[in-house]
A protein has these predicted regions:
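Long, low-hydrophobicity ectodomains and other hydrophilic envelope-associated domains
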Residues: 429-540, 544-547, 553-556
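Detector for repetitive beta-architecture
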Residues: 27, 32-33, 38-40, 52, ...
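Boundary at the C-terminal end of the N-terminal hydrophobic targeting segment
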Residues: 17-23
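Extracellular beta-strand-rich solenoid/capping regions of secreted or surface-exposed proteins
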Residues: 27-30, 42-61, 71-95, 103-115, ...
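Bacterial N-terminal signal peptides
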Residues: 5-14
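Acidic/polar low-complexity surface segments
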Residues: 69-87, 117-164, 170-173, 182-186, ...
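A short, compositionally biased micro-patch
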Residues: 29, 55-56, 89, 111, ...
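Extracellular/secretory pathway-exposed regions associated with glycan biology
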Residues: 532-607, 611-668
Length: 668
């Protein structure tokens, strides 16, 4: 069969093309080694099934140095990015080097490939969700779930690089920043992942699902995080530096910096193990990594057998959360300033030895719960008692509670028996020192997450010093050290007209009852950076009802209004979130609310937004504009609303579990 390869004719040019309707010059299909002309090539892609470029064949080497693929127009919001830049569709001995890819849902996707090399590619600034958690309170909308990927469900969360059914790969010197996910791998084996930087991402640095026999070494995987606001909440929302799920076994993870992630490591046996009690993500070796400064767990490893040796684990909620771990080694690690350094429920035959604990609240906590779900397959198939620990040769300094152990049997202390420890994995030749250098930023106070993810500290930024709704509002001036000047201020006065980074300014709203200001500073290089806030108080009259006796779905609010009002209150906003009662005096579950209010908006274009779990309906001036009247997890609905006076009505109900209701008006 004759092979046809189409080449770009426009050297170094900038053109905007569609992957579905492209001129003949664009290489839609590449089947041989070649060099693409340098330059920025703007090629849209509707989805992962219509890639900008497809690579198909074997023994192909593409050096894309100087080539940039851009999938979306400049100024497009990151959650609107779509499509796939490069698809590697089968074959053997394929190399992609030095590409720069931005503005897509997925940068590079390789499937059914043997002996793949991805080296020196920059897949930064691709797709990421808009986040709705705020300084003071999280939103459940931002939670993710990576528990199933048998049908590529992970693709809904985007990726810089996505590998499926890849056997034998060298992934090195790639960069993914300021997207949602860095490197995502499923159903693959025998990979070497080293000298990469997957940092400042809003979800995962590296995600692994049914990945075996692979090495992850010498990588910088820092600030892969969401769901954290320093001093307010630490939830993580299933973000992590490294995620290993569903029978990911026999891997080596060594000499990586995995700090400031939602979790550092998030390892889980998988749903098949939850149902059957068999298998797990087992026999992985974690050696010499830095798993520090996680809002939740430095290491979360559950329902599995693994070795954790010589790691640094500092300033996490839990240093190790090891629920249902068995036959695992936790040896020679340095724990410091964790709330609970090691916490294991229902663990068995684990060894905790030769670790140091410094200034932790609790060093070792072991326990079993009094009851377990009788319908859960895992305890039906396995003995899940907490038992059979060897705890020896650990050093403690400044620890408040050395051990806290309940409902746990057969603990051996200070034994002299020999413990067989795996050898240190050999470093890869030319492997980088991935660790954060002395004097650089360390600590959870340096995690700042805005609506697009973690701040990377490379550019100036204004951020609240405390609550974001304070008046006057104190703003920190963050970023590289330099001078700044006040560029503009509308709707507010500013405490200073010039200053230095780092620093602080105070902003006082002058707009009256409605807070509507924007402040712009200019740094020493001429870059502008801004902070704005809009808040229109609404005169809400809120009435709550107990609907526990009303079992029909959805609730009939005409009938609900005939019930006794259990809480009658007034507020200037609707903003509820709780896993229990959303307000004092209400039951935890089965409630309904009717709210009526009036708002006066200034001139301009606005959006009325709701975040709801469960049902919500909204009327504006008597017209139904949002109608999501069913049981659902937290979801966002938006409709436009104009300036002026409006009468608003909100109906809401919540059945069981977590409840969330936010009704707000935001300026365009």
């Amino acid at each position: 069969m004759k092979r046809i390869v189409l080449l770009l004719a426009l050297l170094g040019s900038e053109v905007w093309l569609s992957a579905q309707a492209r001129p003949a010059q664009l290489p839609a299909l590449i089947e041989n080694s070649l060099a693409l002309p340098r330059g920025t090539h703007r090629v849209s892609s509707a989805n992962v099934d219509t890639p900008a470029i497809t690579v198909r064949g074997s023994n192909i080497d593409l050096d894309l140095r100087g080539v940039e693929l851009v999938g979306s127009p400049d100024g497009t919001a990151p959650d609107k990015f779509a499509g796939l830049a490069i698809l590697i569709d089968g074959g053997e001995n394929i190399t992609i080097r030095n590409a720069r890819i931005r503005g897509y849902k997925v940068g590079i996707l390789a499937r059914n490939v043997k002996n793949l090399t991805l080296s020196g590619n920059d897949v930064s600034h691709n797709w990421k969700q808009r986040l709705y958690s705020r300084v003071e309170k999280e939103s459940l909308v931002d939670w993710m779930s990576y528990h199933n990927n048998e049908k590529d469900e992970w693709l809904r969360y985007g990726a810089g690089i996505y590998l499926k059914n890849v056997e034998g790969a060298r992934i090195d010197r790639n960069i993914a920043k300021q997207g949602q996910n860095g490197l995502m791998i499923t159903h693959s084996k025998n990979l070497t992942i080293w000298n990469n930087e997957f940092s400042f991402l809003s979800s995962l640095g590296i995600g692994m699902y049914r990945v075996t026999g692979s090495r992850v070494m010498h990588n910088k995987i820092d600030w892969c995080v969401r769901g954290y606001s320093h001093g307010f909440f630490n939830r993580g929302q299933d973000s992590a530096g490294i995620l290993m799920y569903e029978q990911s076994s026999n891997n080596v993870v060594a000499y990586n910096s995995v700090t400031h992630g939602g979790d550092g490591l998030f390892l889980w046996a998988g749903q098949s193990t939850m149902d059957s009690g068999k298998g797990g993500s087992n026999n992985n070796l974690f050696w010499g990594n830095d798993f520090s400064h996680a809002p939740t767990n430095g290491i979360e490893a559950t329902f599995s057998r693994n070795h954790f040796i010589n790691n640094r684990v500092e300033e996490n909620w839990h240093g190790v959360w090891g629920g249902y771990s068995f036959e695992s080694l936790i040896i020679g690690n340095r724990f410091a300033r964790n709330q609970e350094a090691i916490a294991i429920e229902h663990g068995q035959h684990n060894v905790i030895a030769d670790n140091s604990f410094t200034d932790d609240d609790i060093a070792i906590r072991l326990w079993a719960n009094e009851t377990q779900d009788p319908n859960w397959g895992y305890p039906k198939a396995r003995d899940t008692r907490s038992r059979d620990y060897l705890i020896t040769m650990n050093e403690m300094s400044g620890v408040k509670t050395p051990t806290q152990i309940t409902r746990t049997d057969n603990i051996e202390l200070d034994a002299t028996e020999t413990i067989e420890i795996p050898a240190a994995p050999p470093r890869i030749k030319n492997g980088i020192d991935a660790m954060i250098p002395p004097g650089a930023r360390r600590g959870r106070e340096f995690i700042i997450v805005d609506e697009w993810g973690p701040y990377d500290w490379t550019s100036p930024k204004l951020w609240p010093a405390g609550r974001s709704d304070e008046s006057p509002l104190k703003l920190r001036v963050l970023g590289p050290p330099q001078k700044w000047t006040l560029r503009s201020a509308s709707g507010a006065s500013v405490s200073a007209k010039a200053g230095s980074v780092p620093g602080e300014i105070t902003v006082t709203s002058t707009a009256g009852r409605v807070v509507d200001f924007a402040v712009t500073l200019r740094d020493g290089t001429g870059r502008d950076f801004s902070y704005s806030r809009f808040f229109a108080p609404i005169d809400w009259h809120l009435r709550f009802y107990d609907i526990s006796a009303r079992t029909y779905e959805p609730p009939d609010m005409a009938m609900t209004q005939k019930l006794p009002v259990i809480l009658d209150t007034r507020a200037d906003r609707i903003d509820y979130l709780s896993g229990r009662a959303i307000a004092q005096g209400l039951p935890n579950d089965h409630i309904a609310m009717i709210g009526e209010g009036v708002v006066e908006l200034p001139k301009g274009a606005f959006t009325l937004r709701t975040i709801s779990d469960d049902g919500v309906r909204v009327w504006v001036d008597g017209k139904l504009v949002i109608d999501r009247w069913d049981v659902h997890e937290s979801i966002v609905d938006e409709v436009p609303i104009s300036g002026g006076r409006h009468e608003l009505k909100v109906e809401y109900f919540e059945r069981t579990g977590w409840a969330e209701l936010r009704v707000e008006i935001v300026r365009h």
